[in-house]
Amino acid sequence: SKELVKQRMEGIQAVLSGTPVTIVTSLDGFMDHLAPKESIEEKVLKIQNDSVLKLDEMAERLSDVGYDREVQVEGPGQFAVRGGILDIYPLTEEFPVRIEFWGDEVDSIRTFDVESQRSIENMTEITIYPAVEFPQGEEKGVSFLDYFSKEDTILFLDEPVRLVERGQNIEEEFLEAQKKRLENGYELEEEEAKIFPVADILKKINTYSSIGFFALEMKCRGLEVRE
């Protein structure tokens, strides 16, 4: 869903910002295939006052990174073009943004209210993150865990045994669903239609510094535990 992608992209935005951040996720949150961090960074659009941009090319770029073109912006992940005005609701922002052009030059940037369409606040720049986790043109996915530096990251694992059990259940359900889709004639070649096996994620986790919180059982198959 768009809301789920929004939450994940907010997490990605926080990680890419370079500032210390705490991310809360589940083990299966590491199992999804995402575009590599470098690819997401390349597709982030930064627009400033006085930037020189062609509106039609801008609209095409927004479509390429997952934004839906509409007659009027009503929710996150949408954009609209009216004359020399570009309205866009960035997935990671609280309010939509109206960008007015003078020819090919950005004349003004301001947030606005969806209901009243009235301006809220002038801005000097806006950073627009993709509206999809796997933009067009990507062929190989990575885990969200790969976004984190091993040198600067500590993983806190709450009840590792339960985390692994949940991940295994998710994997089994996913594989069963994929099997049924194949039986019904669907093609499953897209990278985003895959997940990483739990075993692979556990191997990745073992390469990071981590602290586990166990209620009872101190052993967890696949995880290296040191007391």
Regions found by a protein language model. Name each.
Residues 1-227:
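ASCE RecA-like P-loop NTPase motor cores
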